[in-house]
Structure formats: C-alpha cells, structure tokens
From Swiss-Prot:
Keywords: Calcium, Cell cycle, Cell division, Coiled coil, Cytoplasm, Cytoskeleton, Endosome, Golgi apparatus, Membrane, Metal-binding, Repeat, Transport. It comes from Danio rerio (Zebrafish). InterPro entries: EF-hand-dom_pair, EF_hand_dom, FIP-RBD_C_sf, Rab-bd_FIP-RBD, Rab11-interacting_regulator. Residues 1121-1183 form the FIP-RBD domain. The gene is rab11fip3. GO terms for cellular component: centrosome; cleavage furrow; endocytic vesicle; endocytic vesicle membrane; endosome; Golgi membrane; midbody; recycling endosome. It is a peripheral membrane protein. This is Rab11 family-interacting protein 3. Residues 911-1015 are annotated as: ARF-binding domain (ABD).
Length: 1183
C-alpha cells in the first residue's frame, strides 16, 4: 500500500505514492486509497493503519516502555571483539564464508513496499532539464555490496563548471582537516567505473556528514541509444572513503565476507575512464592535520574495557587510512579539465521523466567479469556501489531477494562495484532476467553537510579489487536496508530471501548535525567512556566499507520495486535525500550547546530534561520520520534510530521552492512529525522542531502510466456495476463516508458537464485539475509556528506548541472518527479562540521571515567564507560561488517577500473570517439568550401546569376516597341483610327436610302403584298380543274361506245366468214372450252387482277399523312406557340429590313444573282411555 488514508494534520499517517502530495484540510482527495496492486482499498482506518501505516500512539508507548521499566541506564547489545582480518585473497566470492565471526545478523525483507516520503514529485531544479528519474536509497552501515549480473555499458563522463557550485561539498569547520582515501595493498591497478542509464545511487551515511552529490552526466553508449543521463553524483574513487576528523580516534575494523558476482560479458563498445583522472580527483583538504598517522586497523583491536564500561554505545570502527598522493594543484587542474568537457545531452523521449531533486540524480557503474581483473590491476581506490536496474518509470526500485548471503561480519573479498547501465524503455516494465542473471539493489550513501565538509569525488575508477575489505562497528552508523514496515521482527542470525546486514548498535549513538557556529576542537583527550560523550557526542568520521550483499529482484514486478525505505531490524529510515541538516540555530544557542561539553559538542537531553525547555538544535526530516516510524514491537536496542539523509544546500532549496510551490505541502508533514516528537521520552532522542526553510523535501515525479494505473484502480473500485461509469450519487456517498468535505467541488471537477456520471477520462482530468488547484492552497495553515520554531526563543516554544495543540483541537475531531467528549458550544468556543490565537501567530510569521532572510544571507556568507578558507584548491571557483550565492540570496529574498505577501493575504482573510465568526458568535449568543428566556418561561408554565394537575389529582383522589367509603358502607349493609336471610333460610331447612321426607314417602307409594299397574299392563299387553295373533290367523282363514265362497258364488251365478238364458231361449222357442223374461234377468243381475259392491265396501271398512285398533294399541303402549320411565328408581335418586343441592326457591319451582307435567300426563291418559272406549271398548276389557 503506497498511499494511506491521511488525517488533516498527518500526524500518524504516511503518504508515499509517487505522484500524490501530503493531504491536509484543503485536500478533498484524502479519502481515496490507492493501492499499488491496482485495487481500491476501502478498509477501516484501524485496519489500514495496522497494515500500511504507523500508529503514533503505539509508537509513543513503545518508545517509553523500555526506558521507564529499566531506568536511565538502558542496556544495549555489546559487540564482541573480533580477530584481525586475514590478508589472504580469496579466489571465489564464497571462499571466506568459513571464517565466521560471532555477532548478530539482521535479516531484512525488501519485498514489501514500506511507506516513505522519498517518492514525492518535485520539479527539477538543477542546471539541466529533465534528468533521469531515479531511486534514492540510503544506508548508514558499512556494507560490502556486490551487484548482480547486469548489462555493461560504457558511458562518457562529463562535468560542468557548476560541478561544485551545485554540490557545495565544503567543510565548514576548520578542524575537519582532510578527506583521504586509503589504498589497499592488494588492489589491482586497473579499475573503471561506468555510469548506467536509468538508475542512480546517492552516497549517504547516516549519522555522518551528508555529502551533496556532485553533478555529472553520462552518455549511454550501449543498451539504449535514447538519452544521455544527467547525474549529480560523481563516481567515488575510493575503496575506503574516509572523512578524517581529529575529534575521535580510529577503531579497528574487521573483514567482511562477500559473494562474488557473476558478471556478463563485457561490451566492446564500452569506454573507460583514464586512471590519471582518478588520481587527480583525490582530495586533500589541509595538509596540516592529516589522519595518515592513525594506526592501521589491521594492527588494532577493540578495547574490551570500552565495551564493558558503557553499554549504550558501540565502538566506532573506521577503515585504514592512506596518504593521498594527489596535490591540490593537480586536483584543481583536473576540475578545470572536467569543466570544459561538460555536455548536456537529453532525448525528447525523456522529457516526461522528472528528476528527484535539484541536487541528486542517479549514477551507476558497470563492470564486466571478463575485464574485471585487468581493470582492478590499475585501481588504487574504489567504492562499492550497487545499482538498481529497473523501470525508471517505476522509480527504479526493485524488490530484491538475497541469493547469496554473507556470514555475519567476516569477508575475504573486497567489494566490486558493478552497475548496470542498461537504459530501459519507460513505457515497459522492468526487463526480465536472462541466463540466470540477477538484479541486485543496495546503496552505499556517503553524505556530508555542504556547510561542513568539502568532499571531492573522482571521476575515475570506482571498481574495487577483490581484496580484504574492512568492516567497522560504528556507534554512529546504522545498517539500513529494505524491510517490511509492518513491524515483524526478523530474528538475528536468521537468513531470509532478502538483504542480510550486520546488526546495528544502540540508539544513544545517533549523531546530531553541526550548526554553522560550532567549533570542533580535537577530542583526542576526551573521555570516551563518559556517558554524555559516548551516548551523545557528535562523531565526524565517515567510512564506507560495505558488506557484500547480492540480491535478486523479482522480475516484471514494478509494483514491488519502488521501496525507498531502508531499515535495520524494523527501524524505518527515509532515504533518498529527503532530509538534511537544519542549520538555523542562533549563535547564542550554539554557544550554549558548545559549553555543555568539553569538546564543544551538542549533548542530547537526558531523562530529567523537559523537551519544551530545550534549546532548538539541528534536526533533519528523516530523523523525525524515523521517530514516527519506529515499530513499537522492536527491541529497545533498535528503537529511536535516526538517519541523517542527504541534504540540499541553500541555493538548491530556494530554487526548489521557486519552481515547486507545492513544497510547503510536503513540509506540513514535518510539522506533524514535530508534534508527534513531543510525546516521545527525552531518553529516546528528543528533537527540536524543524525549520522548514532549511528542510529539503525532495521527491520523484511519478510517471503518467503509474498515475493512470493508480487512478484506474480507484475508478474501478468506485465503479461497482462495471459499466465504465461512476454515478455521482455513489461517488458522493463514498466521499462523505471517508470524510471529504468539498464534495460539490469534487463533483464540479469530475463531472463538469453535469451528466450525472463520471467516465475514467473525466475522473483522471478532474483529479489532475484538483491536484493543480491544491498546489496553491493557503500557506497560513501549512506554515505555522512550528515552521520557524528554530528561530523562536526557547521561552516562546511553549506558546508555539500551545498554538499547535489548538490547531489539533480544531481539526482532529472528525477526521479521527472519535466521538467528542465536549458539548458543541464548548467546541465552538475552542475553535473561535484557537482561530484568534492562530491568526495572531500568522502575523508573527512576517517578522520571523524577515529575520530568516537576514539569517540566510549571513549563513550563506559564512559558508562561502568557510569554503574560501578551507578550499585552497578551489580558489579559482570562489568568486563564482560567491556570485552564485548572491543571486541565490536575492532569489530567496524575493521568495520570502512573496511568501510574506501571501501570509499578509492569508492574514487578511483570517481577520475577515474571524470577524465573520465573531458576528456569527454574537448572533448565536443572542439566540442562546432568547432560548434561555424561552426556557425559563416554559419552566414557569410547566410549574403552573404541574400545580394545577396536582390540585386536580388531589381532588379526584378525595372524591374517589369518598365514593369508596360510601360503597363500603353499602356493601356492609347488604352483607348484614344477607346474613339475616341466611339465618332465616337455615331455620327453614328442618321443615323443608320433613316435607321432603313426606313427599318421598308418597312418591314411593305412587311408585309401587305405578309398578303394579305397569305389570298388569304388561300382562294385558301380552295377552292382547296373543289374541291379536290368533285373531289375525282366524281372519286370514276366514278371508280364504270367503274368497273360496265368493268364487263358488260366482261360478254358481254364471251357471244361473246360463240356465236363465237357456230358459229364455227355450221359452222363446216355445213361443212365449221374451221381453218380460229379459227385464227380469237384467234386474236380477243389477241386484247381484250391488250386493257384491256392498260386501266389498264392508270388507274395506272392517280392515280400516282393524288398522285403527292396532294403532291405538301402539299409542297406549308408548304412553305406558313413557309413564314408566318417569317413575324409575334412577330418576327418583337424581331428584333427591337435586333437591338436596338446590335452594328452596328452585326446589319449589321444580315441584310446580313436575306437578304440571303430571297433570298433563293424566289428561293425556284420560283422553286415550276415552278414545279407546269409543273406538274399541273390548281392548279395555279384563279377560
């Protein structure tokens, strides 16, 4: 994660994307999270901080825990004395591995991208246009570094008249006598350096003097015919680059084991640098105070007494010195010769590439394996450099892995500097390796303040021979490399797939910078075992032997290549020339600091000192970043490590400020880091706030393709439906969710046509427009009191911090997503008071800037005077330097005037805003008073209503009480009445029981009678049934007889009719009259028919009567059965039980009902008997 969600004050977050700028209150894009893997991150702030940022609260806790638990005397690891190095040359790179030395190894993980400030874009401020984009890495430990298998190119070295004007490699103090480069007896005589295309190395030594790189240029003649690379760091022609100082004696050094790199074949077209130029560039500052008299490191050992005496420091070890055989006149002649050869060749394709800073660009050197021995034979001095051959568009950084690991601290081979000069197409990714070639990355920075040292670097051979290199244990240097910034510790001695460096020493040995007024007398008589000196004394010795580390970077992975952090055991260190010395301490303060020790050196504060009472001293931005980036889980011996980064001189910084007005945005982080430093314990190297005028902020401009890829990742994250457009509503919700305040302005930039959707082109164009617009935001918020704290008197420091605290109160609330514990009115009051105090301090900036302008002029004059006194070899350039300084001072004054005008405008705006806020506050006060009056009136009305309701409630309660009493009285009277009735009913119970017994006796008698009658009835019914059966049988028999008789009668009638007819016929034949006979016959026939009809009707009547009788009998049977069921025993028992259980009234009612039923039954029986008597009396007869 290269960009982290940043708060407005930026106290606890880093922002290290190659193009973005430090976010503030004015930046509405602070909520966007751009991931290097082209993915948008929308995680919560806590998760983001855990993975990609530094938690200042944990840092503050971790930085104090060890000191508080262990007291003032913190124990740090001791380094055991090691035997003198062997003088045997090893033929192979790994032949010396068997000679192990007891010590600690720190394993570094360089695969992850750590947050850094080294990749910020600034405009190119050097004398050339559009220098190559490069990667800045730093190390403070002596590392013997061997490059991987890189392509070889032979560049042409050039320089300019401004070779030393832009670098100002000057030793300000007269006690820093010379810079001698020692020679090794085993060094071969031929060595050459080659400047590669597309890479760079900045020499820098943490805790030592920052060497401003010398500007040179080289032409790539082999790998890419495109451009000539303009570089500002000349090849250092020294195996042991040593800035001698009489302050401290030298300590013994020890050999380091390095691996021998595999070198590809040498290109025939490569050009070499003449050996005489190497010798001509060897400087010798002053012959009166040479360090050649110091004993050789091969004949000395570490003093165990010092190791035992004080555990807070580790003894300083330096490389053996050698006499320089190059005279100052010869060096001066060489400088003139080089100045006439300077050329500037740039290709149009490289125009879009930006230089990282105005004083630092890349230098690289390459050497083929086949030509190595021949060139080493002529080499007397060399410096080990390792370069990164990667995509310059990806800022030339590679995620490296260790393929060959050196054993702890012993070596038998001298480092060999092989630098790849292959230029890569900026539009492509890093080139893959071929034939097992490996790409290695490391750096050996050597930095010296331009105000304090002159360091001439040779343009000749820079390749080291394969010989014993001397490693040192230094209390003032730290081995830095790339490591995971998430806080994971790698155990000592454990080998990973990354760079392995020797362990670092205690933090108490961090070196402070010198002020322009410090005097550095010789300290040969100082007590090095004293606590103040050993823990806090400034050491001015520089050594650059390095441990050979060969790393391999991952192919085709530019996302993992830009890691500008270097670290030792979780000690994050910003590299790449981001920070330099802050020489803004006043003369009186310098004098006070000089008087604290015998050697006139500044002494760091102890636990008992209050940070707010300290005299502001020099500080660089890298140290503050180190304070804010130390992982809390790191061991106490590796906490609070501050690197000294490469610094910009005054002229370069002024040019930087003119060409890049956005630099103050980067300076805002310095303010926040100063605030964070207040929370650290004094034992953990308390530091004074930084003077932004002298804080160099250098960054690299990200390539356009990387910017587009990062923006596309954000756009794809916002484009949820994947249609290539982002709706305005979704973007507004996303912006509000991450605290963006100027959402309307964002939508105005991103959707100028008002279509409601945002395409990627509009998104990219809008973000660019917003970035350009933000470059001119008010400096009243960035250039706060902490910007010029170094100019403020110590007693005013507390007020300045109070102002900063008020600013934090104004801005920290919502951005940290923490609910406020104060009321809104109190917060508004704090904001108004803080704004008034803040604007008051804005006016103070004007006077301070004027003092600052005068001070800058004095500093420049003093620096050039020091240069003229210490640089006899540069006599012919002194006038040019002074003229350049005058022009630069004039430019600075103009810049300061411009800033004063801007501050005045901002002050006027602040006054207007303050007046408006006062008016609003007055309106709010009136409104609050009116509301208070309304509240009082409402309270009075409420009290009156409450009293009225209380009275009503009391009256209602009294009424209810009276009603309850009356109801109780009524109920008592009713109860008394019921008791009387109950007593009466109880007295009636015996009588009723006697009546019940009498009635039961009568009931039993009736029951018996009914039983007798029923029995008789049953008998009669049985006899009747028998008789009915017999009757029906007889009737059936009679019917058959009747039918037979009827048939017989019919036959007889027929016969009679035949006879009558026959008679009539016979009479007719006899002559009688037939009419009378015929009439008689007809009459007789009619009578017969009528008789038959009468008989039939009678028979039918008889059958109907029989049916009627049967039905009557059935009715009588049913009636008898019903009456019998009424008088059964079960019914009588249930009736008695019911009589016992019911009341008197119910009993009387039941008796009346029963009597009615009996009456009805009696009437019904009587009617049945009457009907029987009328219809068939024979049924009732007793037989």
């Amino acid at each position: 994660m290269e960009q982290v969600l940043s708060s407005p004050q930026g106290c606890s977050e880093w922002e290290v994307n190659g193009k973005t700028e430090w976010e503030s209150d004015q930046n509405p894009l602070g909520f966007l999270l751009v991931d290097k893997e082209n993915s948008s991150v929308a995680d919560p702030t806590n998760e983001i901080f855990q993975e990609n940022a530094i938690n200042l609260d944990d840092l503050f806790w971790a930085s104090q825990t060890y000191s508080w638990e262990n007291g003032l005397d913190c124990v740090y690891p001791e380094w055991k004395a090691q035997p003198p190095p062997s003088q045997d040359l090893k033929g192979d790179g790994n032949s010396g591995i068997s000679q192990l030395v007891e010590g600690d190894l720190i394993c570094f993980n360089s695969r992850s991208a750590s947050p850094s400030l080294a990749d910020r874009p600034v405009q190119d401020n050097n004398l050339y246009d559009h220098a190559e984009q490069v990667e800045v890495t730093a190390t403070s430990s002596t590392l013997n570094v061997c490059t991987g298998e890189l392509g070889i190119n032979a560049p042409t070295l050039h320089t300019d008249k401004t070779l030393l004007q832009d670098t100002h490699l000057m030793l300000e103090e007269s006690h820093l006598t010379n810079c001698e480069f020692s020679c090794n007896s085993g060094v071969e005589n031929e060595s050459q350096n080659f400047l590669s295309h597309g890479t760079r190395n900045i020499l820098e030594s943490e805790g030592l003097f920052a060497v401003s790189p010398v500007e040179v240029s080289c032409v790539d003649t082999n790998s890419n015919p495109k451009p000539t690379i303009v570089c500002q760091t000349p090849p250092l022609a020294s195996e042991h680059i040593y800035l001698s100082s009489s302050a401290l004696p030298c300590e013994p050094v020890f050999p380091m084991t390095c691996t021998k790199p595999h070198v590809p074949p040498y290109h025939a077209g490569s050009a070499t640098l003449p050996m005489d130029e190497v010798e001509m560039m060897l400087p010798k500052l002053q012959g009166g105070e040479g360090e050649s008299s110091k004993p050789s490191a091969n004949n000395r050992t570490l003093e165990p007494q010092r190791l035992d005496a004080n555990t807070d420091t580790t003894h300083l070890s330096v490389c053996p010195l050698g006499e320089s055989d190059i005279s100052p006149e010869h060096c001066e002649e060489m400088l003139h010769e080089l100045s006439t050869k300077c050329t500037v060749e740039m290709v149009e394709e490289e125009v879009n590439k930006k230089s990282v800073s105005s004083n630092t660009t890349n230098t690289a050197f390459s050497k083929p394996k086949t030509e190595l021995c021949e060139e080493l034979s002529g080499c007397t001095l060399g410096v080990l450099l390792e370069t990164v051959s990667g995509d310059v568009k990806e800022e030339a950084a590679s995620d490296s892995r260790t393929d060959h690991v050196f054993p702890e601290t012993q070596t038998d081979l001298a480092p060999v500097a092989l630098i790849d000069s292959q230029a890569e197409d900026p539009s492509t990714e890093s080139l893959p390796r071929k034939n097992g070639q490996e790409e290695s990355k490391s750096a050996l920075p050597v930095s010296t303040p331009e105000h304090n040292a002159l360091f001439e670097l040779s343009s000749g051979n820079v390749v080291l021979p394969e010989d014993h290199s001397q490693s040192t244990f230094s209390a003032q240097t730290q081995a830095l490399s790339e490591v995971d910034h998430d806080g994971d510790l790698t155990p000592d001695g454990m080998l990973t797939d990354n760079i392995v460096c020797e362990a670092v020493t205690s933090i108490d040995s961090v070196i402070l910078s010198l002020t322009d007024s410090f005097e550095l007398p010789k300290l040969s008589d100082c007590d090095l075992s004293s606590h103040d000196f050993e823990s806090h004394a400034l050491t001015l010795e520089i050594q650059n032997n390095v441990t050979c580390v060969q790393t391999g970077s991952v192919d085709n992975n530019p996302e993992e290549m830009s890691t500008p952090f270097t670290c030792t055991d979780n000690q994050l260190t910003v590299t790449g020339g981001l920070a330099g010395l802050d020489l803004t301490e006043t003369t009186s303060q310098s004098g006070e600091a000089s008087g604290e020790g015998e050697a006139g050196l500044p002494v760091l504060p102890t636990h008992q000192e209050d940070f707010h009472q300290l005299t502001p001293s020099e500080i660089n931005l890298a140290q503050e970043q180190q304070v804010s980036s130390v992982v809390p889980s790191s061991p106490p011996s590796h906490r609070d490590v501050f690197p000294c980064g490469a610094s910009l001189d005054g002229e370069a910084y002024l040019t930087l400020m003119e060409n890049n007005p956005d630099t103050l945005k980067h300076a805002e982080m310095t303010l926040d880091l100063c605030k964070a430093s207040d929370a650290l314990p004094t034992k953990s190297l308390q530091i004074a706030p930084v003077d932004l005028i002298h804080v160099p902020i250098v960054s690299a401009t990200a390539p356009r393709s990387e910017e587009q890829s990062a923006l596309r990742a954000v756009f794809q994250a916002l484009d949820q439906d994947g249609d290539g457009f982002v709706h305005i509503e979704e973007f507004i919700e996303f912006a509000k969710a991450y605290g963006a305040e100027q959402v309307k302005d964002l939508t105005r930039f991103l959707d100028p046509s008002g279509l409601g959707v945002i395409s990627f082109e509009d998104f990219h164009r809008g973000i660019s427009a917003i970035s350009n617009e933000e470059s001119a935001y008010s400096e009243c918020e960035t250039f706060t009191d902490e910007d010029t704290t170094a100019l403020v008197h110590p007693e005013l420091h507390e007020d300045v911090e109070t102002d900063s605290g008020i600013e934090n109160t104004l801005t920290d609330g919502d951005d940290r997503n923490s609910p406020s514990s104060f009321p809104a009115s109190f917060q508004n009051f704090l904001q108004s008071e803080a704004l008034e105090f803040f604007c008051t301090h804005c006016h103070k900036q004007i006077s301070r800037l004027e003092d600052l302008s005068t001070r800058l002029q004095l500093l420049e004059m003093n620096r050039h005077l020091q240069q003229s006194n210490n640089l006899d070899v540069m006599g012919d350039l002194t006038q040019d330097i002074l003229d350049l300084a005058d022009r630069d001072i004039t430019d600075k004054v103009l810049l300061l005037e411009k800033r004063v005008c801007e501050l005045e405008k901002d002050s006027l705006e602040s006054e207007e805003q303050h007046a408006r806020l006062r008016q609003e506050n007055l309106t709010l006060v009136h409104r609050a008073n009116a509301l208070e009056e309304q509240l009082k009136e409402q309270e009075l009305r409420t009290e009156e209503d409450l009293l009225a309701q209380t009275r009503k409630h009391r009256d209602a309660l009294n009424k209810l009480q009276r009603e309850r009493d009356l109801e109780i009285e009524n109920l008592q009277a009713r109860l008394h009445q019921l008791d009387e009735e109950n007593s009466e009913l109880r007295s009636c119970v015996p009588c009723l029981r006697a009546n019940i017994e009498r009635l039961e006796e009568e009931k039993r008698k009736l029951q018996d009678e009914a039983d007798d009658i029923t029995q008789r009835l049953n008998e009669e019914s049985e006899s009747r049934r028998k008789m009915s059966d017999k009757l029906s049988h007889e009737r059936h028999t009679n019917q058959k007889e009747k039918e037979c008789t009827q048939g017989l009668i019919e036959d007889l009638r027929k016969q009679l009719e035949h006879l009558q007819l026959f008679k009539l016929e016979t009479e007719a034949r006899r002559g009688r009259s037939s009419s009378n006979g015929l009439q008689e016959y007809n009459t007789h026939m009619r009578e017969n028919e009528l008789e038959q009809e009468i008989r039939r009707l009678k028979q039918d009547n008889r059958s109907l009567k029989e049916q009627n009788d049967e039905l009557n009998g059935q009715i009588i049977n049913l009636s008898i059965q019903g009456a019998k069921s009424l008088f059964t025993e079960s019914l009588s028992e249930s009736l008695a039980a019911e009589i016992n259980n019911v009341s008197r009234a119910e009993l009387m009612e039941a008796i009346h009902k029963q009597e009615e039923i009996n009456f009805r039954l009696q009437d019904y029986i009587d009617r049945i008997i009457v009907a029987i008597m009328e219809s068939n009396p024979s049924i009732l007869e007793v037989k």
